Amino acid sequence: MMALLQTFNHKGIRQLKYREKIWQVVSRIPRGKVATYGQVASLAELPGYARYVGYTMKMLPRGSKLPWFRVVNAKGELSFPKHSAQYQTQQEKLEAEGVVFSEGRFCLRTYQWMID
């Protein structure tokens, strides 16, 4: 039983560290720029964890100030189902920062955050 508890605690601590790394990267994405899930994972030193980045964004507490909406997929699209409330919210927030959409997409080359 004690070994199981230690394993759980270790896994929980590791996941918290992963989330903190992801949050730090996302907090640095500038206004008017986006980063892909894979890019955030790589910058957080978690290569191959793109899906975990998505999960972490999904689990943000309501009212979080983290700019979750700046994290997008590698196709230059939003990952929410089109016409959903979440899709509309994300698109509106990005457009308010100057990201231009055309037919539900934007030019990733133009808006992708590149670290100097």
Give the residues covered by each predicted segment.
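Nucleic acid-binding interface residues in structured DNA/RNA-binding domains
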Residues: L4-D116
